[in-house]
């Protein structure tokens, strides 16, 4: 499955300062579905280069990270249980900024 992953609000610094990633992900289990929980695990293993604790806490994103799936807040679509489809665009934006 192909996805576009975008990181903003400083999260791109955890991915070698690359904001947009076009990725291909093979299904992690024998089913035909991939969930946000599966994707987050893949991102932690394959994209996050440093300080993964700044992006994730346990199995989910840290508080203060806005997640959009095809421009829709993931809280409206089931969060970790959100089912992803080929060519989806997932955006991660940190809403926490120093000052």
From Swiss-Prot:
Transmembrane segments: none annotated. It is found in: Cytoplasm. Pathway: tRNA modification; 5-methoxycarbonylmethyl-2-thiouridine-tRNA biosynthesis. The modification 1-thioglycine is found at residue 99. The keyword tRNA processing applies. It comes from the Eukaryota. Acts as a sulfur carrier required for 2-thiolation of mcm(5)S(2)U at tRNA wobble positions of cytosolic tRNA(Lys), tRNA(Glu) and tRNA(Gln). Serves as sulfur donor in tRNA 2-thiolation reaction by being thiocarboxylated (-COSH) at its C-terminus by MOCS3. The sulfur is then transferred to tRNA to form 2-thiolation of mcm(5)S(2)U. Also acts as a ubiquitin-like protein (UBL) that is covalently conjugated via an isopeptide bond to lysine residues of target proteins. Belongs to the URM1 family. This is Ubiquitin-related modifier 1 homolog 2. It comes from Arabidopsis thaliana.
């Amino acid at each position: 499955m192909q996805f576009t992953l975008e990181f903003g609000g400083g999260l791109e610094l955890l991915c070698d300062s690359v904001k947009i990633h076009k990725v291909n992900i093979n299904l992690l289990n024998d089913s035909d579905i991939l969930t946000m929980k599966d994707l987050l695990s893949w991102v932690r293993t394959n994209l996050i280069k440093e300080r993964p604790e700044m992006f994730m806490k346990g199995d989910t994103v840290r508080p203060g990270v806005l997640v959009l799936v095809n421009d829709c807040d993931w809280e409206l679509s089931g969060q970790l249980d959100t089912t992803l489809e080929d060519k989806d665009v997932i955006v991660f934006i940190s809403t926490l900024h120093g000052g």
